[in-house]
Amino acid sequence: MQPTLFIDRDGTLIDEPKTDFQIDSLEKLKLEPKVIPALLRLKAKYRFVIVSNQDGLGTDAFPQTNFDKPHNVMMALFESQGITFDEVLICPHKPEENCLCRKPKIKLLDHYIRKNLFDIDRSFVIGDRETDVQLAENLGIRAIQYDPQKMNWDLIAEKLLGETVTNCGKRPPRFAEVIRQTKETDIKVQIWLDEAGVNEIKTGVGFFDHMLDQIATHGGFRMNVQCKGDLWIDEHHTVEDTALALGQALKQAIGDKRGIARFGFVLPMDECKAECALDLSGRPWIKFNACFKRDKVGDFSTELTEHFFQSLAFSMLATIHLNVTGNNDHHKIESLFKAFGRTLRQAIRIEGNEMPSSKGVL
């Protein structure tokens, strides 16, 4: 069985027009940024299969010839760069037809399932829509939801290849595992600081899971977080104790700090202006400046954002300054987690062998 990437076409490989959601002319054909370099890096490890819904293909509203011309040019372009797809699987039906082959249904992939043609543990669906995520669930594999800003092709390749981005000095891999058990929570955190990859995060708080994934993704490392907390009361203990366990794991994985950059700074992120400054100083401190209009984003209390970073700073013995301005609370919180991840990525990067302190210790 071969590791396989089942890849959506419109909005993932190529840009999807927001006017009519059809690529029916050469003028509309536009590759997504960095898709060719990413696929070139991935092709040694994965087989590629395109799986696409094309509403009304073959009808007067979307003639087959109008589809074929830009599609064939796209395929020829990929092939000219050394990228080939084993198959192109297309559902031509509209949602109201309720067919069996339209994503997230799996009939298009029946032969892959019956003949065990893909490695369940090492195959992924990559697409920009929730239906792509649901397709992965129906296949029993994992999904990576493409987004040109939040999860672009560079990040996807980095995740799938597990490439080292923080250990330029080629020191021994930095790993830590922390188990924290209290009356309120049971938490296990594993961190691979020098290995990017797909993160397994389950805290029971969906928005919080997404935020933790942002830290690891933009930090250039891989982590697993499993938490069972007293969510029947609220999410406070889950968020706080996860921050404490994560901070402890980061501190352990970083180790004696010899050779690290120590400092990090980044701004802005997304349409919000999020600033983060970090010093792995051994002296815990937090300066947090953010105002939220809503009490909750999804299942996450906005007031816990500051508490998370405060708990994290004191657990990992770091100085953290965070500031964000913007209009959308969801985007503001997400930009803070992403900015922290990017800043942490700089600070944990190994650049030599010296202790980054005039005192000789951190």
Swiss-Prot record:
Zn(2+) binds at C91, H93, C99, C101. Keywords: Amino-acid biosynthesis, Cytoplasm, Histidine biosynthesis, Hydrolase, Lyase, Magnesium, Metal-binding, Multifunctional enzyme, Zinc. Mg(2+) binds at D8, D10, D128. It catalyses: D-erythro-1-(imidazol-4-yl)glycerol 3-phosphate = 3-(imidazol-4-yl)-2-oxopropyl phosphate + H2O; L-histidinol phosphate + H2O = L-histidinol + phosphate. GO terms for biological process: L-histidine biosynthetic process. InterPro entries: HAD-like_sf, HAD-SF_hydro_IIIA, HAD_sf, His_synth_bifunc_HisB, HisB_N, Histidinol-phos, IGPD_sf, ImidazoleglycerolP_deHydtase. Residues 174-362 are annotated as: Imidazoleglycerol-phosphate dehydratase. Residues 1-173 are annotated as: Histidinol-phosphatase. GO terms for cellular component: cytoplasm. Its EC number is 3.1.3.15, 4.2.1.19. It is found in: Cytoplasm. The active site is at D8 (nucleophile), D10 (proton donor). Pathway: Amino-acid biosynthesis; L-histidine biosynthesis; L-histidine from 5-phospho-alpha-D-ribose 1-diphosphate: step 6/9; Amino-acid biosynthesis; L-histidine biosynthesis; L-histidine from 5-phospho-alpha-D-ribose 1-diphosphate: step 8/9. Its cofactor is Mg(2+); Zn(2+). GO terms for molecular function: histidinol-phosphatase activity; imidazoleglycerol-phosphate dehydratase activity; metal ion binding. Pfam families: Hydrolase_like, IGPD. Its main location: cytoplasm. PROSITE patterns: IGP_DEHYDRATASE_1, IGP_DEHYDRATASE_2. The keyword Metal-binding applies. In the N-terminal section; belongs to the histidinol-phosphatase family. In the C-terminal section; belongs to the imidazoleglycerol-phosphate dehydratase family. This is Histidine biosynthesis bifunctional protein HisB. The lineage of its organism: Bacteria, Pseudomonadati, Pseudomonadota, Gammaproteobacteria, Pasteurellales. The gene is hisB.
